[in-house]
């Protein structure tokens, strides 16, 4: 035993002796040999693998010297993986033991490799061994590690929907990153993605491993079909079945995904020397929005990731977007079409029956050039979507087969595709009773609950009728509304409220009131058109004319006790809205009806000539444009029962926004005379001559105080002193009450007139008044 130990020590000395003259290098070599001899297990020969050696070094805390970082391929790992693919897990463990290496594959890795391994494509026996060897050699030359894009027999798929270039502002700007954690419930990642989808304008590109969130798919469908934004989906082949299951539950196929491309992608392929291979998964997850920003991270498009799983994403801007743009182009070139969702550029895959074309609203479509094939420069791809140039998604709701897809509603349904000759996606698993509702409203029933959108799964529903349809019934179908027309002698329809009360609660108009047809026609003819070039909206009361016309068909009599109440309520509702001025001009249209019997033809024509719209000023004066019908003269006895407390017709008019001086000028001279009748009689010619010409019967707002004071004194003098020379002039309360009729021919409140017109008009009246005062 001692000899063995001495021999061992002598062996080490001999091994280290040739390096004794080399100084420190010899000491390091002998030290490494001693250490390896101590850690080497008994009964083993040769050196341990690199992974085992490094682990043993790191387990000893006293080891001070750090080994250099070696970035090289592990041949032991390659041999073990090939043995696993060719002969199974037992051969893998045997190679690990022989190479003195650690079992580096986990149980998850071993299961994936064994379940996804596939061999070389088998050839027929008639070819013989020579043909087999020749084909294998040619296959080895073609599928070498060198990439020959121009010699490829298959062109990569085109970005046929369009792909914009990276904006220059994005390419030259520095990288900006904002991190979003799923732990922050106030700012969830799903809400961020939905917001970005709603704001996209040029393109949306999604690379995702698992996609089972229905809300996110609806957002992408709305962006593609409603707003015409091209959408590209690259989904992992491993979890593609879950996406197809979601589409089956929603009763979706390729015909519904308008302006959207769905393709599958996978990872790299690992090949052994014997020809066994397996393909990895595509675990990249990022979203490109308009080639301006990228959202990348660990978030998957699943309900659990939005509610339970924790994840994080980075929202990136700047020139880093170009790297993601290049990566997406590479992934899209390597992707494969999805059965049932392939486009016209995939001739090898079964096509989904396309709906009939829709007549374009802006001319024929322009075929787009290819942009991703190697023969044509991939960087100069399509700059806009063909759907943006075409307006097929803007078709009217009954205009063709693509209407439902373009407008984002349900498509013709499963029955449509079955009639076309090819069943829709997973139709062999659907319920045989699942039939689209017949009739011309089949496309519109999706919004009413009869489509599979309102069902959890078509395979679980044994009835083609939606629960919402059973509960509500056929009234949900759109029906044409009959045209309503007025007939003579029918009750008046309820009109819009003018004083804040609906027609049913109006105290002045009972519910059983009948409006004759002639009165309604008169109201319609006398409606004043609203000027859209001004900012005012003057509302006139149409029923005031019908109530005061006093025609033979009207039921309102002069001696009715409710006449004053109705006229007062009608006058109160004559409120015109003015948005650009502080004054509200209220026009009394009923006075002209009561006074038309006493006006001379000359004054009536003069009044009609003043009914013009002043478009040069800021307000819209609405005046009766048709001559008032001659009302029957009402005797003064008819007003004896009205009561002395009833104010005059002008006093009952409510003015808003006028100055206090204007109100005093308007109402002062008549309130001091005491109560008068509610409706004035005919004005006497003496009173008309005593006041002045008809040009001085207009109240103006915004004038100087001198003009208003002068006018006030003129009215006071005309009231207190009758015209001399005509004895026996009646002076009574009726005359006092009829002083409001002095301004009857011209009851329009004018705002914003020029000073020259006002000065000219008032100088004419002042000259006559001042001369008569000085002479007396």
Curated annotation (Swiss-Prot):
It comes from the Eukaryota. Residues 344-467, 494-565, 617-653, 669-694, 716-745 are annotated as: Disordered. One of its GO terms (molecular function) is protein kinase binding. The gene is Fam83c. This is Protein FAM83C. Residues 452-467, 554-563 have a biased composition (Polar residues). Coiled coil: none annotated. Phosphorylated by CSNK1A1. Residues 523-539 have a biased composition (Basic and acidic residues). Residues 1-340 are annotated as: DUF1669. PANTHER family: PROTEIN FAM83A-RELATED (PTHR16181:SF29). It is found in: Cytoplasm. The keyword Transport does not apply. Residues 368-385 have a biased composition (Low complexity). The keyword Cytoplasm applies. Belongs to the FAM83 family. Keywords: Cytoplasm. May play a role in MAPK signaling. All members of the FAM83 family of proteins share a conserved N-terminal DUF1669 (domain of unknown function 1669) domain of about 300 amino acids. This domain mediates the interaction with casein kinase 1 (CK1) isoforms. Therefore, it has been proposed to rename DUF1669 the polypeptide anchor of CK1 domain. Directly interacts (via DUF1669) with CSNK1A1 and CSNK1A1L. May interact with RAF1.
